């Protein structure tokens, strides 16, 4: 999908709503689960100027790190942003300011970045390349619910990201566990209260 076309679609929808007397926020709320959670995170990183709130669940224990390198080693997308010059320092600052919530079920076994213990590479090489997997395992870890999930949170918090994380015990790969939290965030960030535009 061309992200610029998506932004144009959003703007077109906003204009059509306005013509019908329906006011909308200047920024969007983007929410995704599993593969679409990665889209929500990456879209927010690439276009933070249009996002008010980003929500993602079942994120495979990791997010794209909004940094270019670690200890002098360039981070390649989607592990980091070392090869994405379009993500400027200003965009990184905007991204860190966007309200975000990411969550995992602690019984989730759906790991698209799982490692093949025999050859020490990714099982699903059509999802992540060998070089990307090498960096992912090196800096975040191969264990989805262990080091990878923990280190991702540590990186985002250390960078000062406006983020919350949720870990739900006894839950697998499904969004239900976080529904109350997600609904609360939506209510807090929708552009109206009690049927009145604000």
Stretches with model-predicted labels:
Residues 133-134, 143-198:
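C-terminal catalytic histidine-bearing segment of alpha/beta-hydrolase fold enzymes
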Residues 31-36, 40:
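Gly/Ala-rich beta-loop-alpha elbow adjacent to hydrolase catalytic centers
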Residues 28, 100, 163-164:
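Hydrophobic anchor at the start of a short beta-strand
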Residues 42-53:
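Conserved hydrolase catalytic core segment
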Residues 53, 60-159:
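The feature captures the conserved acid-bearing segment of alpha/beta-hydrolase catalytic domains
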Residues 22-23, 35, 47, 92-97:
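Extracellular/periplasmic catalytic domains that process cell-envelope and extracellular macromolecules
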């Amino acid at each position: 999908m061309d992200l610029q076309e998506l932004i144009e679609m959003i703007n077109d929808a906003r204009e059509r709503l306005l013509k019908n007397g329906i006011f909308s926020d200047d920024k969007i709320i983007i929410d995704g689960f599993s593969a679409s959670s990665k889209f929500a995170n990456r879209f927010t990183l690439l276009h933070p100027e249009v996002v008010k709130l980003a929500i993602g669940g079942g994120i495979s224990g990791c997010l794209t790190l909004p940094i270019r390198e670690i200890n002098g080693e360039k981070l390649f997308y989607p592990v980091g942003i070392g090869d994405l010059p379009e993500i400027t320092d200003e965009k990184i600052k905007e991204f860190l300011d966007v309200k975000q919530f990411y969550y995992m079920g602690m019984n989730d076994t759906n790991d698209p970045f799982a490692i093949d213990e025999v050859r020490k590479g990714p099982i699903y090489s059509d999802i992540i390349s060998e070089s990307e997997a090498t960096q992912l395992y090196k800096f975040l870890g191969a264990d989805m619910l262990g080091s990878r999930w923990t280190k991702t949170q540590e990186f985002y918090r250390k960078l000062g990201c406006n983020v919350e994380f949720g870990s739900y015990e006894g839950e697998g790969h499904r969004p239900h566990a976080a529904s109350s939290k997600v609904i609360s965030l939506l209510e807090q960030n929708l552009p109206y209260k009690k049927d009145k535009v604000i």
